[in-house]
């Protein structure tokens, strides 16, 4: 039987049977689950391909217009029955302040991309040991959202029939949103449930809150998903219940991460353990 050596606490080398040494080495699955330093080129390629795949699948889901409008009418009636149908009032109130609604239109069109990428870059540079687990939570959240788009097509409030919601992008002729205006034919108009604006912004907010050191930065982390909720309602792109769907997807994403990594991202070491 072959032998290998280990170094004792006193610095002396001792022979260890090869079978024992082999048993102490992590297996392939354990090595995959162990946090490691991410490779920049691989992460750029992975994120680009993953987002392209997500967009392709999301927009390939059949636009079931009639069912999406029925589902929107049902949610709107249910909210009225429960006394929580505030979306139209918020939409009209914010639309009356031109500079505010124009800013919200651009916020809706851009920030969920920009800030999500910014948080990923920050994790990559400052928390490489937690990066992989946090990225897995984001990817799992986004993947399960695709199931929602397929199983529950939902029209946004601005596309409902017989209601007075204002399509703020059309009215104020702002650019950037693929949900309405000239770019609407490039995006699935009936993929409102769940809201990934909320799923992604809450992921960003919780990541910042749990990992940032400065108190004011942590507070900004919590304010970001709150502001996003106001924006998606004010622009009539979502019911607020769509935000609940996004939160449920994020909870699923964190559950996947907890199962795979054995801990949530913030509980993992900041720096990856050196591997063999």
Protein language model regions, located:
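Interfacial helix-loop-helix junctions of multi-pass membrane proteins
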Residues: 154-163, 188-193, 227-253
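Alpha-helical transmembrane spans of integral membrane proteins, capturing the lipid-embedded, hydrophobic core
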Residues: 43-55, 113, 117, 138, ...
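Aromatic-anchored segments of alpha-helical transmembrane domains
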Residues: 52, 56, 142-150, 223-234
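Membrane-interface loops
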Residues: 58, 65-77, 86, 124-217, ...
């Amino acid at each position: 039987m072959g032998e290998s050596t280990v170094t004792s606490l006193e610095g002396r080398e001792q022979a260890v049977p090869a079978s024992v040494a082999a048993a102490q080495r992590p297996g392939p699955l354990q090595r995959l689950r162990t946090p490691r330093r991410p490779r920049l080129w691989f992460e750029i390629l992975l994120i680009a391909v993953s987002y392209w795949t997500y967009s392709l699948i999301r927009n390939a889901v059949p636009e079931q217009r009639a069912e999406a409008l029925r589902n929107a009418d049902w949610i709107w009636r249910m909210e009225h029955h429960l006394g929580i149908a505030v979306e139209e009032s918020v939409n009209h109130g914010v639309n009356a302040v031109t500079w505010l609604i124009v800013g919200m239109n651009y916020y809706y069109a851009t920030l969920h991309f920009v800030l999500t990428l910014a948080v990923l870059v920050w994790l990559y540079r400052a928390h490489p040991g937690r990066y992989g687990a946090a990225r897995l939570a984001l990817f799992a959240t986004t993947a399960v959202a695709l199931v929602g788009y397929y199983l529950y097509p939902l029209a946004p409030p601005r596309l409902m029939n017989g209601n007075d919601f204002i399509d703020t992008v059309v009215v104020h002729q702002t650019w950037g949103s693929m949900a309405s205006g000239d770019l609407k034919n490039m995006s699935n108009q009936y993929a409102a449930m769940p809201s990934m604006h909320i799923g992604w912004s809450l992921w960003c907010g919780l990541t910042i809150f749990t990992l940032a050191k400065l108190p004011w930065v942590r507070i900004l982390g919590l304010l970001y998903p709150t502001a996003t909720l106001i924006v998606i309602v004010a622009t009539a792109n979502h019911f607020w219940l769509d935000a609940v769907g996004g939160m449920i997807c994020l909870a699923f994403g964190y559950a996947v991460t907890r199962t795979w990594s054995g801990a949530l991202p913030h509980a993992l070491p900041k720096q990856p353990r050196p591997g063999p």
